[in-house]
């Protein structure tokens, strides 16, 4: 399973809200020896794959052309809408 991710340079609550209004959501990739990286993912692409068991085993994120193998660590969902607010990924 592979997703295209975009590096985020605009951080903070306001930037995250603007990002969610465009159909993307914020996420972070951490772990291993590399520094944590803030990214954004397409909401619809991820939501369509979240009901599959493979989603929670291993994912490949393409971040600016570089493939990173990750596993979802945490998912923050909206209180009553079927939306993802934020995700944490850990490198494997």
Curated annotation (Swiss-Prot):
GO terms for cellular component: cytosolic large ribosomal subunit. This is one of the proteins that binds to the 5S RNA in the ribosome where it forms part of the central protuberance. HAMAP family: Ribosomal_bL25. Belongs to the bacterial ribosomal protein bL25 family. Keywords: Ribonucleoprotein, Ribosomal protein, RNA-binding, rRNA-binding. It comes from Vibrio cholerae serotype O1 (strain ATCC 39315 / El Tor Inaba N16961). One of its GO terms (molecular function) is structural constituent of ribosome. One of its GO terms (biological process) is translation. This is Large ribosomal subunit protein bL25. Part of the 50S ribosomal subunit; part of the 5S rRNA/L5/L18/L25 subcomplex. Contacts the 5S rRNA. Binds to the 5S rRNA independently of L5 and L18. NCBIfam families: PRK05943.1 (NF004612).
């Amino acid at each position: 399973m592979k997703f295209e991710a975009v590096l985020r340079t605009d951080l903070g609550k306001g930037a995250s809200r603007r990002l969610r209004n465009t159909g993307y959501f914020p996420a972070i990739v951490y772990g291993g020896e590399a520094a944590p990286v803030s990214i954004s993912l397409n909401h619809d692409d991820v939501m369509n794959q979240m009901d599959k068991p493979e989603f929670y085993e291993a994912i490949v994120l393409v971040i600016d052309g570089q493939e990173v193998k990750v596993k979802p660590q945490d998912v923050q969902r909206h209180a009553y809408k079927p939306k993802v607010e934020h995700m944490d990924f850990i490198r494997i």
